[in-house]
Every structure is written in C-alpha cells, then in structure tokens.
C-alpha cells in the first residue's frame, strides 16, 4: 500500500473549484486577546454562538475582546483520602478498627 502514492494531489487539503460565481457563507469575525497581549481573530458562521474563550495558536487561552465575558468555572474542592474514607465508614467504625489494630500490635510485641 505504501508503494502506491497519489502524485500531484493532496487529499482533503485543497479544493480545485474556483471561487468565482459562488457566495461564501455569511461570517462574523471574533477578536480575542491572550494574557500576554497577543490579539487574534477567529471567523465564525453568522448564526454561531461565539464562545467567551478560544485557544490561540501559541497554546494560550484568549478571551473575547468585545462581548460577554466567560463565566468563571466552578471549582470543586479536592477530595482527600479522609473524605473518601468517611464515605465508606463512620467515625465509630474507624475507632473500633483502630482499637483492633492497636491490640494486634500490642499482642505481637508481648509474644
């Protein structure tokens, strides 16, 4: 399969149809700015909802210059090991387990 190559054609990259006598889809241009001050434009369809943030080519996130600011994301507090333990056992059960383990350790030391 690697022997056969389509020469002179880039699949999916180029349209060989001319742009004459064709109306392009209506577009709107959204301008974004990154934290380091770089501004860039992204074309959207006229009826598309413009997002408040967009990832720039340099990898930084840009915010919309004109329009609604994005809503801050809700941050969930991190679940700790203790939180997960309390989901499975009550404090009374944990105290009982602690007593059992302490008795086992003490009996090993004696014997």
UniProtKB/Swiss-Prot annotation:
Oligomerizes at more than 3 uM; this requires the C-terminal 32 residues. Forms a complex with the RNAP catalytic core, specifically with the beta subunit (rpoB). Interacts with free SigB, probably as a 1:1 complex, and also with free SigA, probably via its sigma-2 domain. Residues 1-24 are annotated as: Not required for interaction with SigB. InterPro entries: RbpA_sf (IPR038638), RNApol-bd_RbpA (IPR025182). It comes from Mycobacterium tuberculosis (strain ATCC 25618 / H37Rv). GO terms for molecular function: bacterial-type RNA polymerase core enzyme binding; bacterial-type RNA polymerase holo enzyme binding; nucleic acid binding. Signal peptide: none annotated. This is RNA polymerase-binding protein RbpA. Binds to RNA polymerase (RNAP), stimulating and stabilizing the formation of stable RNAP promoter complexes up to 2-fold from principal sigma factor SigA-dependent but not alternative sigma factor SigF-dependent promoters. Increases the affinity of core RNAP for SigA, increasing the transcriptional activity of RNAP. Unlike the case in M.smegmatis or S.coelicolor, has no effect on rifampicin inhibition of transcription. Has no effect on E.coli RNAP. HAMAP family: RbpA (MF_01483). Residues 80-111 are annotated as: Required for oligomerization and to complement a conditional disruption mutant. This protein is only found in actinomycetes; as it is essential in M.tuberculosis, it might make a potential drug target. Gene3D superfamilies: RNA polymerase-binding protein A. GO terms for biological process: positive regulation of DNA-templated transcription. Keywords: Transcription, Transcription regulation. Belongs to the RNA polymerase-binding protein RbpA family. One of its GO terms (cellular component) is peptidoglycan-based cell wall. The gene is rbpA. Disruption phenotype: Essential for growth, it cannot be disrupted.
């Amino acid at each position: 399969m690697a022997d056969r190559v389509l020469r002179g054609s880039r699949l999916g990259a180029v349209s060989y149809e001319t742009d004459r006598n064709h109306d392009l889809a209506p577009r709107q241009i959204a301008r974004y700015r990154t934290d380091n001050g770089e501004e860039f434009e992204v074309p959207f369809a006229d009826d598309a909802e413009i997002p408040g943030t967009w990832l720039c080519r340099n990898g930084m996130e840009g915010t919309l210059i004109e329009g609604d600011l994005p809503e801050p994301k809700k941050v969930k507090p991190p679940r700790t090991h203790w939180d997960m333990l309390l989901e499975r056992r009550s404090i009374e059960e944990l105290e009982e387990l602690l007593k059992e383990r302490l008795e086992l350790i003490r009996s090993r030391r004696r014997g």
